[in-house]
Design a protein with these regions (language model features):
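Ferredoxin-reductase
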Residues: 1-128, 187-189
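FNR/FR-type flavoprotein reductase catalytic core
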Residues: 68, 98-190
Length: 190
């Protein structure tokens, strides 16, 4: 792990450098899988608040995220779309939204008594220098790059990861300037 910082209240930009000598050839729009080991964690003790950032901490405190605990009893894998594009080097960038339990129905307050997401919780505990096991690339969400037809991307929240990869590849690697491209992005406000 070389970086794991919040880029929005509940979204991390998680960047992993591949081991020396390793290279991943992929088409923008692909995804990678990350191994999630067995673990127990307490959000208050195990999530590095400095990696959330001062800008986002008040919302985490307001919504009671630091009261959450998570336990994964069986090793598993989860798939995340890669936000990086090939020219960014031998690294994998994921955008990960913390998967919190749903809120209690009113008039109750707080979260329902179910576990938060096991993969997002694990990823939110990782710090620069930590080692993770990942595999890939996988998937077939690949646009036709050599067409003249308009490209329209629609995404929201952390789901914009593969769209970033495709847009950056088209504009920075292929230097496409004569093809109409539209990007529509939606995000929740607090």
């Amino acid at each position: 792990v070389i970086s794991n910082r919040n880029v929005a209240t509940f979204i991390k930009e998680f960047i992993v450098k591949l081991p020396e000598g390793e290279h991943m050839n992929f088409i923008p729009g692909s995804y990678a899988q990350i191994r999630i080991p067995e673990y127990e964690m307490d959000y208050d003790k195990d999530i590095d608040k400095s990696l959330i950032g001062d800008e986002y901490l008040p919302a985490w405190e307001k919504f009671g995220l630091f009261t959450l605990k998570c336990r994964n009893t069986e090793e598993t894998v989860r798939a995340y779309s890669m936000a990086n594009y090939p020219a960014e080097g031998d690294r994998i960038m994921l955008t990960v939204r913390i998967a919190t339990p749903p809120f209690q129905p009113k008039p109750k307050t707080g979260f329902m008594p179910v576990s938060p997401g096991i993969a997002s919780s694990y990823i939110f505990t990782l710090k620069p220098g930590d080692m993770v096991l990942m595999s890939g690339p996988y998937g077939d969400f690949h646009p036709i790059f050599d067409s003249k037809a308009e490209m329209i991307w629609v995404g929201g929240g952390a789901g914009m990861a593969p769209l970033r990869s495709q847009i950056m590849y088209m504009t920075r690697t292929l230097h496409v300037t004569d093809r109409k491209m539209s990007f529509f992005y939606g995000a929740r406000a607090l």
